Amino acid sequence: MKHGMWKPWTLGIGAVAVVALLGVRAARVAAGGGQAGGGTASRLLAGSIDFHVHGLPDMEPRSVDSADLARTAKDRGMRALVLKNHFDPTASLAYTVRKQVPGIEVFGGIVLNRTVGGINARAVEHMTQVTGGWGRVVWFPTRDSEYQVAAEVKDNPASKRPSVSVSKNGALLPEVKDVIAVIAKHQLVLETGHSSPQDSLLLLAEGKKQGVQHMMVTHGAFEMSLAQMQEAVKLGGFIEFVYRIIPMKDGANAKFTPAALAQLLRTIGVEWCVLSSDLGNPAYAMPTEGFGEFLSKMLAAGMTERELAQMTKDNPARLLGLPAS
C-alpha cells in the first residue's frame, strides 16, 4: 500500500506525549477548537461540509468526541459533517449528535468491514431504517478490504487475517451488486473505501449501471493514477482528497505539494473533486482546525475561494442530496 495511508492506527509519538497532547486539545475544544489560520480559515470553513471525519465513540483512539466535534464545527460556521467509523455504523450517532448539537447537519453511514458482516445488503437496508434517516453513505471495505490486508501482509506476514473481497477474476461478486441495488433504491452515496483502483472502477461502473446518483472514490489520489481518476469521473464518481495528501505542520506523510495538488484538482475538474479532512487521529491536527489549515494552504497555493467552495460546499451538498448553499 503506497504512502502508508491505510495502515491501522499507530502512534507517531510516545504514549506520555499523547496523553499530554489530548489534554491540551480537550481544552482547545472547550474553548472553540483553535483558529486554524485565523480569519482566512474561518472564512473558508463557513458553510463547508466535512465529508470524512472520525470522532468518539470508536474502538480506536480519537482526538475528540463526536458531539464536541459538531459543536466546534458549528461554532466555525460549518454546514455539515459526515461521521465515519471503520467498524460501527454511524446513523444512530448522527441522530444523537443532531439532538445534542442543533444547528449543524450531521450524517452517518456504514463501512462494509467484517464487523457488519462484510458485503451485507441487509445491514445497508437496516441503516436506512434508523431513526432520522441520517445514514446516507455506504463505504465498501476499508480496513478489512482484500487490497489493504494484502498490502499489510506484504509488509508484515504476521499480520495475515481474513479480508473482505468485492471481486473475483475481474468481476464484482453477486453480493456486491446486491448492495449496490440497495444504494440505488435509497439514493445513498456509494464510496469505494480502500478498494484497489481496478475494483473502485468496477464499483463505479456497476453503480452507474444500476442508477446510483451519488458516488465518490475514497481519498482516490493515494492509489489511483490520473488516468484512473479521469475514468472514475467519466463513470460519474467524485474524487476525494484529504488533509494528509499535502505537507502539514504535524509532519503527516504527503504525496503532493499544495501547488501540485491545485494543478491536479484543476486537471480533473474542481466540479468533480471533494476536499475532506479524514481527521480524528490524535497524532494529527484536531479535525476542524486541520480542515481549515488544509483549505488555507490550498488558497495560498493559488486556488480561488470559489474553487474551494465548489469542493467543500457545492459538491458535498450534491452528494448528500442537499440544496445548494
Write out the residue ranges for each language-model feature.
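Catalytic pocket-lining loop regions of alpha/beta-barrel enzymes
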Residues: 181, 188-193, 197-256, 274
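Acidic (Asp/Glu)-rich catalytic clusters
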Residues: 42-44, 74, 94-103, 126-133, ...
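Structural preference for beta-strand elements that scaffold enzyme active sites
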Residues: 48-50, 80, 105-107, 135-139, ...
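An N-terminally biased module of ancient metal coordination in phosphate/nucleic-acid-related enzymes
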Residues: 29-104
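Mid-to-C-terminal alpha-helical segments outside catalytic/metal-binding sites
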Residues: 288-325
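Extended substrate/RNA-proximal surfaces in nucleic-acid metabolism proteins
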Residues: 117-197, 203-216
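Active-site beta-loop-alpha junctions enriched in small/polar residues
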Residues: 54-56, 86, 109-115, 141-145, ...
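Short acidic/histidine-rich active-site segments
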Residues: 270-287
